[in-house]
């Protein structure tokens, strides 16, 4: 039976879940994750304890709890559950308070609130921009892009663009490289004025064929030889044009996005 892991937060739980994934990935073990967001009252804290204790009885072992509860009373309630409780705020905030000689705000959901802030508006604008400029569907206002991802179809451009927008507020457009571009031997004319904003994504041809076969099985588009041709041509074009690029084959979206930010020297706040 898989160990049960609870992600308990008084907000969305995104911070706690990200941290939990980073820690749990160090163990060669699968886990059953239970998300419990918006625990913003004592009643909800007691209800959460009931869930945790029920899981412990069912599993025959203590649950594991990652918590970012700010309210000390709610936190104390959860800590009385039959679980190993890993309190991120107590572990990190209290030492920082001592080091900085400052008292933290102890405000619930502080990391994911205030829809009227400039940071939030910047992120929404970036998401809208990336959606409008997905897969080369619009050349309008390309000059506003922070980065333009290029690569063959299904090389990871769309998810990377959206991740950059949602996580960092980056206006990321993406543009497909197609056989017609390879025949001409040069980039699409729409991209010519923005060469300094281009970043390329490549992928292992065999992996590309597998991905494309899920979409259009048995087609020329998904054939291994066609995928090899497109990848070879795309990489050759990126080398000729001096475009920095990486292979997305064995990299997570997070790793790809971080590399892009470093390579194009974009200084962005993580949300």
From Swiss-Prot:
<keyword id="KW-0723">Serine/threonine-protein kinase</keyword>
<dbReference type="GO" id="GO:0043531">
    <property type="term" value="F:ADP binding"/>
</dbReference>
<keyword id="KW-0547">Nucleotide-binding</keyword>
<dbReference type="InterPro" id="IPR026530">
    <property type="entry name" value="PSRP"/>
</dbReference>
<keyword id="KW-0808">Transferase</keyword>
<dbReference type="GO" id="GO:0004674">
    <property type="term" value="F:protein serine/threonine kinase activity"/>
</dbReference>
<dbReference type="Pfam" id="PF03618">
    <property type="entry name" value="Kinase-PPPase"/>
</dbReference>
<protein>
    <recommendedName>
        <fullName>Putative phosphoenolpyruvate synthase regulatory protein</fullName>
        <ecNumber>2.7.11.33</ecNumber>
        <ecNumber>2.7.4.28</ecNumber>
    </recommendedName>
</protein>
<dbReference type="GO" id="GO:0016776">
    <property type="term" value="F:phosphotransferase activity, phosphate group as acceptor"/>
</dbReference>
<comment type="similarity">
    <text>Belongs to the pyruvate, phosphate/water dikinase regulatory protein family. PSRP subfamily.</text>
</comment>
<feature type="binding site">
    <location>
        <begin position="151"/>
        <end position="158"/>
    </location>
    <ligand>
        <name>ADP</name>
    </ligand>
</feature>
<keyword id="KW-0418">Kinase</keyword>
<comment type="function">
    <text>Bifunctional serine/threonine kinase and phosphorylase involved in the regulation of the phosphoenolpyruvate synthase (PEPS) by catalyzing its phosphorylation/dephosphorylation.</text>
</comment>
<dbReference type="GO" id="GO:0005524">
    <property type="term" value="F:ATP binding"/>
</dbReference>
<dbReference type="InterPro" id="IPR005177">
    <property type="entry name" value="Kinase-pyrophosphorylase"/>
</dbReference>
